[in-house]
Amino acid sequence: MRRFAIFAAVLIVIVGIGSQPWNAGGASGWRGFLNSFRAHAKHADQRDGRAIATSDGWVIRDCSGQDKDHTNWGWGHQEHACEVRTITIAKPDKLDVSSMNGGIHVVGEDRQDVHVEARVEAWANSASEAADILREIQIETSGGAIHDNGPNFHLGHQGYGINYVIHAPRQLSAELKTLNGGIELEHLNGDLKFDTTNGGVDLVDLAGDVRGSTVNGGLDISLSGDKWNGKGLQAETTNGGITLNIPDHYSAHLETGTVNGGIEVNFPITVQGDIKHHLATDIGGGGPTIHAETTNGGVTLSHGSSTGGDGDSSGGENSES
């Protein structure tokens, strides 16, 4: 089956260039032929159910037959192509991830390396056009930086998106940026910065110095343990609500507010003055500041059991009292 697929790919390439002289374009003509052959052979292997290992360390498998991911973009009646790319890299001094279209999800684990899974999806008017777009998308990993590059589109009938799921050590310094997509951080302790324009933010069981914002999206924050370990948390949104889940018997200095919206507190606290749009108080024995605010949206504060486990924010060599 694989031999037949590769043979078919060779025929496709030869037919495509058969009307031109073999020496057309000189060396570049031969390079174009070889690149086309490799691309068709790679996708023939993928359609045959095989994962492809690339020379730069990525492993690629086809996911075009699976359900389309509607997380960050819509498909309409367009055709799509999909592949999952994975790579494992050494733990960097700082993890720097940036993307135009797609979410970034980083999970802290008991490990010493960083495993990256990128689900790359492209859409166009035809399946072949979508597959061509996939082949143009590059993901670069160098010195802890993970950046993607692809073609620019000005019309909605063509495009692509990349959703990252990254498994990293719990002790981590990271900066995450995306334009169109959500950001999720779980079970991490360190200097963590995040920024998205169009997407929600989920923060679960974190510690250290955590700062970031979204323009269009909500904030969902779940604290763990009995206090914040580290400098504190500062998270902001312009258009979106805030949900803050605080464990019983938690100690921190809490600040939250909204311009156009209300504040709902589902547990007893002691405050001075009106809390209609702004709240600042110590809970428990006080401590580092937990700051979360929105311009347009409501704020809900709830009590619940700690979300922590082995990775809760009360531990870690980089934490501060």
Regions found by a protein language model. Name each.
Residues 109-111, 142, 227-228, 249:
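Short strand-connecting beta-turns/loops that link adjacent beta-strands
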Residues 2-113, 121-126, 130, 154-161, ...:
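Short acidic/polar N-terminal linker immediately downstream of export determinants
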Residues 88, 210-214, 218-321:
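Short, surface-exposed interaction patches in beta-rich subdomains
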Residues 67-69, 73-94, 103-105, 130-195, ...:
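Right-handed parallel beta-helix
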Residues 113-120, 252-254:
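A compact, surface-exposed functional segment
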Residues 45-48, 180, 184, 191, ...:
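Asp/Glu-rich intrinsically disordered low-complexity tracts
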